Amino acid sequence: MGDSYYNYRPGKGQALVKQSVATNKQDLPDKCARRGNKLDGLKEKDLIGIPWMLAFALRADGWYLRQDIIWNKSNPMPESVRDRCTKSHEYLFLLSKNQNYYFDVDAIKEPTRRKRSVWNINKKAYKDAHFAVYPPELVIPCIKAGSEKNDLILDPFMGSGTTAMVAKSLGRHYIGCELHEGYGKLIKNRIGELRGTLEEFI
């Protein structure tokens, strides 16, 4: 999950968030700034901490926050800022609804050890998408460890359909939700391209 920097400009029609450290392109809608939605405690140029805010909100709602996982990118998006380091990681969170939950640690075991909490995975472009697409390798261990074959996978933000594609490849069913109507064709085409094994598709 990406994060953003705080840039409060009430009444000027500017975006509340100037820069997204996830893609260097994504901004919150202008209407947020026009409404003057200032978040308490945040100062100009503060890193908002959206991933952790979401994780803590889910925990407060009753979920169990079991682990944070670092997605380390060796080929991150370049940034022009000169007063901090270039952002090269994002967060994944392992959450559960109960204390006892399904987790197949052996399904994602590395050759000589159990999988660590820092995942080194390069970003990959998808030819038909003009936005950032996360790589299938990021989804594979999540689905392998968190579900069994014929289980149902839910992706509430479907985007280009990466999660659905991986779920289908691993013998799972899937449901995806996407507000942007234009992505429907992209999703169908991407899943339709899937032939043979997941490794062959990647």
Question: PLM ranges: what are they?
Answer:
Residues 1-194, 201:
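Core catalytic lobe of class I
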